[in-house]
């Protein structure tokens, strides 16, 4: 029974397939197209006609006209036929049908299929008239404007649903401008809404223009909101590039960046693989990019909530007059105090804003006009100072109607907070704390604690402090701040601080203060002469200097050697003279023979001079012979025409006693000698007429003789003397007894 029922069922099904054929009614085929029913010009298109098995031929029609006929292969029966079109154009656009034949009968036509070819006209424009971000279930208004007057407009949505809206335009016949407003909705968060607009002529509805730019409507969903941040920061100078990061769910497929108030999506990024971060570029930044931004992401689960708002500020828009930012006399301030920063400009702005470089602090104030200076300014009071206030600051100007468009930045001002490192630092000055203008000074800051950077600050200077990396020497960290050619402006009180690289603006406690005093310049006469030597000649100069030094030392050595040798020779000569003198004294003492002088050759033409000279020799001879006075003589050098010179007279003993004439002093003898040298006349007659007087003798000891020639006076006849007289000036050693009443 069961078998019979199964056999009858199979027979019924088989008959069901062939009953339409037997009755002359073939099943209607189904027509499809690949890749899409809307394609651009030049695309390859394939039509597929699906029919029943056993069809002998298949037919394809466009606008009721046969386009293709394809016979079926009985060896390989199939239930579909493909019609291929290469490089389609606007002539291929239209309404298509297909049919087939089987057992000598034709089937009905398939349902119509429109093939739309785009790119025949210029593209229209499409924009959102309301915020392109809506909540789920909301509506949006899109405006489409054709590029050709009178064209019908069509709005399409990308996706499997193939939604579209057609509408004739509203045209202004005077301006020939046409547009259509499409009110679309409700929009759900379970799909993407990407719209495009086309235009076409009424008589050729399948030949469209090129598509407009896409407009995607973001539907705020319920997925977790992403985070948003900007690099290098949300305040950026015009013309530079920036990156906006949006981080969301791991299943995110695409990210969107939207600027509030804009009718278009600012930027999108489709991820090749699902991920939780997107990198959205804006380059170069212009003033049109200023504003508030949010980002979204879409995944298979729908849309996310919007991120927090990111305010993007574009600077450098107004650059007529630079802004100035000034602060306390020293940028180094203690923790807990208050600091006032002044932002000034010659140009009017509605507001000034003070911002920290890391953008963790900002404050804006209305500007005030200062009539005395002709400037606009704002005073920013910060305090009490904490580590959060340390860093670099700038101020900008802007107007209320464009709060995200700022001026050029002011100068950079650094604020350093002290007392953050409990290190002990020391500061010393070399060569001295008091120097002359133009000299070089070195301030050394050091500590036994680990310090990455030393900071040298001058009280009240208003200048940024000096920074130097520390160096380890002698088991201590130190830095040397060298100042060459100092002036009086560098006089003042200095302190040094230390910091770590991880927190450059957080400083240690200050070192003990050091006062530097720079006095007036050194006088030029006190300075040694200097010479500027070019760097390329320094090597030659050093070689020449070494050569001169060696030559000088060699010359000095030779000079010392000659002096020592000469001194040695003088010593031996003196010893020889002393020995010779001793021998002569011994000979003169031992012989005791009278000393006679041959005076025959010293005849004078002047009788007075001759008489005086004879008296002198006679006195000396008489002293030797009568009184027992010993006489020592030295022979003059050979060739001396003056003969012997009496050098020393030494009394042995006194033979007489009686009246002694006064001793003749050395001055009197010298006076007589000088008168003789000057050639003064001697009154010989007065000498001859006077009575003979006693001659006074003095014991003399002379080591050196001075010889002079005296020109005697002319004789009465006017004749010159025959030869000059020679006299010897004797130095008196000590007084002694002399003979009395010795006549000349």
From Swiss-Prot:
UniProt GO cellular component terms: plasma membrane
In-chain residues carrying the UniProt-annotated modification Phosphotyrosine: 697, 727
Glycosylation sites: 79, 338, 440
GO molecular function terms noted in the UniProt entry: amyloid-beta binding; inhibitory MHC class I receptor activity; protein homodimerization activity
Residue ranges annotated as motif ITIM motif 3: 725-730
Disulfide bridge positions per record: 49-98, 144-197, 246-295, 343-395, 445-496
InterPro entries noted in UniProt: Ig-like_dom, Ig-like_dom_sf, Ig-like_fold, Ig-like_Receptors_ImmuneReg, Ig_sub, Ig_sub2, Immunoglobulin_dom
Cytoplasmic side: 565-744
SUPFAM superfamilies in the cross-refs: Immunoglobulin (SSF48726)
Record's comment on post-translational modification: Phosphorylated on tyrosine residues by LYN. Phosphorylation at Tyr-697 and Tyr-727 is important for interaction with PTPN6/SHP-1 and PTPN11/SHP-2.
Keyword Ligase: no
Listed PANTHER family: LEUKOCYTE IMMUNOGLOBULIN-LIKE RECEPTOR SUBFAMILY A MEMBER 5 (PTHR11738:SF179), MHC CLASS I NK CELL RECEPTOR (PTHR11738)
Protein name: Leukocyte immunoglobulin-like receptor subfamily B member 3B
Gene that this sequence comes from: Lilrb3b
């Amino acid at each position: 029974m069961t078998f019979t029922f199964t056999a009858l069922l199979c027979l019924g099904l088989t008959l069901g397939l062939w009953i339409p054929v037997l009755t002359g009614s073939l099943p209607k085929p189904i027509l499809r197209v690949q890749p899409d029913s809307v394609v651009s010009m030049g695309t390859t298109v394939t039509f597929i006609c699906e029919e029943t098995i056993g069809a002998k031929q298949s037919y394809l029609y466009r606008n009721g006209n046969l386009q293709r006929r394809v016979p079926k292969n009985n060896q390989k029966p199939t239930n579909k036929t493909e019609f291929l079109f290469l490089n389609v154009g606007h002539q291929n656009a239209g309404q298509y049908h297909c049919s087939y034949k089987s057992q000598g009968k034709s089937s009905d036509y398939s349902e119509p299929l429109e093939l739309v070819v785009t790119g025949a006209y210029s593209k229209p424009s499409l924009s959102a008239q309301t915020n392109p971000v809506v909540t789920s279930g909301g509506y949006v208004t899109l405006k489409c404007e054709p590029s050709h007057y009178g064209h019908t407009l069509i709005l399409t949505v990308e996706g499997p649903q193939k939604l579209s809206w057609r509408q004739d335009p509203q045209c202004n016949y005077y301006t020939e401008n046409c547009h259509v407003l499409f009110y679309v909705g409700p929009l759900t968060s379970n799909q993407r809404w990407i719209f495009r607009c086309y235009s076409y002529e009424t008589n050729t509805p399948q030949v469209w223009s090129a598509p407009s730019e896409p407009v995607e409507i973001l539907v705020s969903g319920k997925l977790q909101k992403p985070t948003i941040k900007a690099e290098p920061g949300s305040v950026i100078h015009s013309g530079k590039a920036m990156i906006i990061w949006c981080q969301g769910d791991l299943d995110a497929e695409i990210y969107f960046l939207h600027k509030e108030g804009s009718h278009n999506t600012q930027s999108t990024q489709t991820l090749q693989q699902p991920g939780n971060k997107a990198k959205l570029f804006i380059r170069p930044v212009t003033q049109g990019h200023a504003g508030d931004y949010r980002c979204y992401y879409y995944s298979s689960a729908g849309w996310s909530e919007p991120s927090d708002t990111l305010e993007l500020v574009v600077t450098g828009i107004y650059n007529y007059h630079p802004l100035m930012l000034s602060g306390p006399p020293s940028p180094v301030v203690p923790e807990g105090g208050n600091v006032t920063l002044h932002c000034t400009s010659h140009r009017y702005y509605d507001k000034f804003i003070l911002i920290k470089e890391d953008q963790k602090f900002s404050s804006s104030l209305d500007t005030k006009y200062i009539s005395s200076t002709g400037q606009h300014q704002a005073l920013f009071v910060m305090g009490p100072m904490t580590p959060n206030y340390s860093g670099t600051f700038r101020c900008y100007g802007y107007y209320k109607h464009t709060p995200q468009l700022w001026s050029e930045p002011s100068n950079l001002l650094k604020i350093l907070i002290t007392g953050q490192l409990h290190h002990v630092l020391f500061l010393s000055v070399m060569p001295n704390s008091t120097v002359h203008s133009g000299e070089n000074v070195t301030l050394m800051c050091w500590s036994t604690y680990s310090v990455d950077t030393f900071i040298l600050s001058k009280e009240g200077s208003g200048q940024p402090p000096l920074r130097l990396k520390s160096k380890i020497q002698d088991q201590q960290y130190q830095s040397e701040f060298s100042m060459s050619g100092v002036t009086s402006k560098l006089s003042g009180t200095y302190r040094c601080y230390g910091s770590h690289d991880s927190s450059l603006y957080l400083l240690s406690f200050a070192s003990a203060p050091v006062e530097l005093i720079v006095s007036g310049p050194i006088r030029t006469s006190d300075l040694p002469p200097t010479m500027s030597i070019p760097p390329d000649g320094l090597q030659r100069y050093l070689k020449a200097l070494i050569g001169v030094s060696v030559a000088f030392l060699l010359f000095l050595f030779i000079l010392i050697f000659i002096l020592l040798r000469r001194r040695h020779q003088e010593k031996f000569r003196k010893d020889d003279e002393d020995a010779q003198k001793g021998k002569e004294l011994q000979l003169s003492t031992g012989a005791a023979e009278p000393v006679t002088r041959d005076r025959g050759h010293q005849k004078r033409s002047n009788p007075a001079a001759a008489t005086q000279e004879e008296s002198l020799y006679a006195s000396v001879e008489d002293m030797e012979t009568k009184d027992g006075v010993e006489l020592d003589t030295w022979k003059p050098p050979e060739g001396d025409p003056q003969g012997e010179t009496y050098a020393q007279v030494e009394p042995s003993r006194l033979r007489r006693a009686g009246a002694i004439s006064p001793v003749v002093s050395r001055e009197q003898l010298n006076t007589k000698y000088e008168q003789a040298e000057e050639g003064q006349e001697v009154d010989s007659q007065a000498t001859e007429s006077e009575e003979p007087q006693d001659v006074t003798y003095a014991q003399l000891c002379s080591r050196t003789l001075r010889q002079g020639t005296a020109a005697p006076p002319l004789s009465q006849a006017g004749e010159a003397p025959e030869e000059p007289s020679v006299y010897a000036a004797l130095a008196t050693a000590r007084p002694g007894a002399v003979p009395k009443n010795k006549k000349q």
